[in-house]
């Protein structure tokens, strides 16, 4: 592993820093990526100073399946890759307006967030894979330009990106680019640890541990696939286990990956899913974040079939998928435009209460579909 000398996001460091700041003179929203303060310190303070009375006040976003470079050649008229990349940029503009949005007016999230102010600026945004459409060098360059790790305009909050099945194999430009990107984030203090090859990463925000395992948590290539193919998870399960071994069983953990957790999925096989479950079932996993399906969902892992196959005992974990930037289109029809102006899961943890709500930029901001009650979520993350 490639650890930092210390985790700059540790709770002890956070409290000692805040203790010498005057609340009257400090405003986290005046900090920028060019602040004379170190970038990691600036973003740390953003994540904790919005709610002075709370021991923890952490906000982060989940988006997925950007598919930069998608070319709708068969729509009428064709909607090319440059037009699609402009669509991505417009979606990012919408995302930049999420901070300051009032929470849903009713329901469990509204109740939990009463008196705690609107959506704060996030500590960061996680992009759960399929960053590009075909994983070539041009598409990677465009993704890295549109969503740089330092933060895209106008959001200016860090972007944590994962490789998906559209992003090519171990030697391809996307995974190679992610390695360089991760090294930059390590140097800036935005991640605490990288895997030996720098593809997988881990960091801590206000005592909440985040682990990025990219495509899915596994060791060894899928049967029949080449070592250099996208089917190589590059020892992500070993990395996950090594991180969890350093984390107490009751400490909150979030795991981010691309592939989904459905028992019907054939993208990663049953033995690998079981090995993953065995690795995490003794830990306080407060959220599993994923993409791949393009669906907006909140599910439980393991589902009933897998749960029975895994022995029928042990915890189940909450899984979240935010949707996609890439809409479905029909041959011979016009480009349909996005399903919503944007699709983003917004998470906030205040003290030991986690809330999650799906943001679409509809009137009022939040998802109002028939599935909205299922997507809205509140839970206590403290192990009793």
Locations of the language-model features?
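N-terminal active-site segment of His-dependent metallophosphoesterases
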Residues: 51-138
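Active-site glycine-centered loops adjacent to acidic/histidine catalytic or metal-binding residues
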Residues: 65, 129-130, 164-165, 258, ...
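Histidine-centered catalytic micro-motifs
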Residues: 256-260, 286-296
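Short acidic, glycine-rich surface-loop motifs adjacent to enzyme active sites
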Residues: 247-264
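Bacterial N-terminal signal peptides
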Residues: 40-48
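Extended active-site neighborhood of metal-dependent phosphoesterases/phosphodiesterases
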Residues: 136-239, 275-281, 287, 295-358, ...
């Amino acid at each position: 592993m490639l650890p930092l000398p210390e985790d700059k996001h540790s709770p002890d460091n956070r409290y000692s820093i805040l203790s010498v700041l005057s609340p009257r003179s400090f405003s986290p929203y005046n900090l920028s990526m060019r602040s004379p303060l170190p970038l990691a310190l600036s973003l740390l303070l953003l994540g904790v100073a919005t709610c002075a009375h709370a021991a923890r006040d952490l906000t982060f976003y989940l988006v997925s399946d950007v598919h930069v470079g998608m070319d709708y050649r068969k729509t009428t008229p064709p909607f090319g890759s440059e037009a699609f990349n402009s669509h991505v940029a417009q979606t990012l503009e919408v995302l930049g307006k999420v901070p300051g949005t009032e929470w849903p007016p009713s329901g469990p999230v509204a109740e939990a967030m009463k008196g705690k102010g609107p959506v704060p600026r996030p500590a960061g945004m996680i992009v759960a894979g399929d960053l590009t459409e075909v994983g070539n060098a041009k598409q990677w360059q465009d993704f890295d330009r549109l969503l740089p790790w330092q933060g895209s305009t106008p959001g200016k909050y860090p972007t944590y990106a994962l490789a998906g099945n559209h992003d090519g194999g171990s030697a391809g430009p996307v995974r190679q680019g992610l390695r360089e990107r991760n090294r930059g984030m390590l140097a800036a203090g935005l991640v605490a640890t990288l895997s030996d090859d720098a593809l997988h990463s881990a960091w801590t925000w206000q005592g909440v541990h985040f682990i990025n395992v990219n495509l899915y948590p596994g060791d060894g290539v899928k049967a029949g696939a080449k070592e250099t193919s996208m089917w190589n998870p590059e020892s992500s399960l070993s990395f996950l286990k090594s991180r969890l071994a350093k984390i107490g069983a009751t400490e909150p953990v979030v795991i981010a990956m691309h592939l989904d957790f459905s028992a019907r999925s054939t993208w990663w096989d049953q033995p690998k899913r079981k090995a993953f479950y065995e690795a995490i079932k003794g830990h306080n996993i407060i959220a599993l974040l994923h993409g791949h399906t393009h669906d907006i969902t909140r599910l439980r892992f393991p589902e009933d079939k897998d749960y029975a196959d895994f022995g029928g005992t042990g915890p189940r974990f909450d899984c979240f998928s935010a949707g996609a930037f890439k809409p479905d289109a029909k041959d011979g029809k016009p480009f349909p435009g996005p399903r919503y102006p944007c699709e983003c899961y917004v998470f906030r943890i205040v003290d030991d209460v986690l809330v999650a709500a799906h943001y679409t930029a509809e009137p009022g901001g939040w998802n109002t579909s028939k599935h909205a009650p299922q997507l809205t979520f509140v839970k206590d993350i403290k192990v009793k």
